[in-house]
């Protein structure tokens, strides 16, 4: 936080979201929702304002939990390296809340301190619920053994998003931010495909993204950095290429 504060300039927006790790039993990470957790949020808001920044509070995105008795989860970080052990036992027809007071307190602090608030819990709850118990897996690092070459033993992580899920949630939250902060609306842009050679998009290769666009379809492709060959086979496709982070396209 001190690094953020040291670099904060008047007029900067500071997006503040905590909760997932505060819920853990580990005393090195745990905070109490009504005391230490709330006090930390107040501190971040207060110190942001003291530097001339504009705080925006979010509550936590939901976990994908369709279990009345949810699976034991001591540490979300461990899920990044776990392998697929068995099919899950879905026993709820509605998404089950795992955050409790940690999702409520940020809203209370926002009202108390007159801070802009984005309800990330509700937004992501709706996204997961609309997809349903099985289809919502495709948002997360949830892969069967052999489904993804780089994760041969599979993975069953209901907390962290894969690239597709991150893209869906980021789009939804960007729209929500624009609603709460009209001054930022002009900066919100949506893209159909994102290309990044270092894995920050849903395609590693520009040509692959172009090939994914159907003939007759309109598509906007964001290119994040890198040097790329001009794509071919674009006939009949209405493609707009947007370059960021020094991206360059050449004929060679």
Where are these regions (language model features)?
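Acidic Gly/Asp/Thr-rich repetitive segments characteristic of extracellular carbohydrate-active
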Residues: 192-222, 227
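A short acidic, often aromatic-flanked loop/helix-cap motif at beta-alpha or helix-coil junctions
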Residues: 123-127, 200-203, 247-249
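Structural motif corresponding to alpha-helix initiation and N-cap regions
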Residues: 1-2, 203
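Flexible, charged surface loops at secondary-structure boundaries
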Residues: 8-9, 212-217, 233-235
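N-terminal extracellular ligand-recognition/capping segment immediately after the signal peptide
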Residues: 218-251
């Amino acid at each position: 936080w001190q690094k953020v504060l040291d670099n904060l300039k008047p007029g900067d927006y500071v997006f503040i979201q905590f909760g997932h790790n505060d819920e853990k039993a580990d005393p090195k990470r745990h905070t109490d929702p009504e005391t230490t957790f709330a006090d930390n949020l107040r501190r971040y808001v207060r110190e942001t304002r003291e530097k001339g920044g504009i705080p925006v509070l979010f509550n936590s995105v939901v976990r994908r939990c369709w279990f009345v008795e949810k699976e034991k989860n001591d540490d979300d970080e461990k899920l990044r390296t776990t392998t697929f052990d068995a099919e899950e036992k879905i026993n709820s027809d509605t998404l089950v809340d795992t955050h409790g007071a940690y999702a409520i307190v940020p809203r209370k602090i926002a009202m108390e301190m007159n801070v802009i608030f984005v309800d990330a819990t509700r937004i992501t709850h709706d996204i997961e619920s609309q997809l349903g118990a099985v289809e919502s897996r495709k948002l997360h690092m949830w892969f069967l053994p052999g489904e993804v070459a780089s994760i041969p033993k599979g993975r069953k992580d209901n907390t962290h998003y894969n690239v597709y899920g991150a893209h869906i949630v980021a789009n939804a939250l960007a729209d929500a931010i624009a609603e709460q902060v009209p001054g930022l609306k002009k900066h919100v842009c949506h893209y159909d495909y994102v290309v990044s050679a270092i894995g920050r998009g849903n395609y590693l290769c520009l040509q692959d993204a172009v090939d994914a666009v159907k003939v007759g379809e309109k598509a906007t492709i964001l290119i994040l950095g890198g040097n790329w060959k001009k794509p071919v086979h674009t006939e009949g496709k209405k493609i707009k290429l947007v370059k960021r982070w020094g991206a360059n396209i050449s004929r060679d």
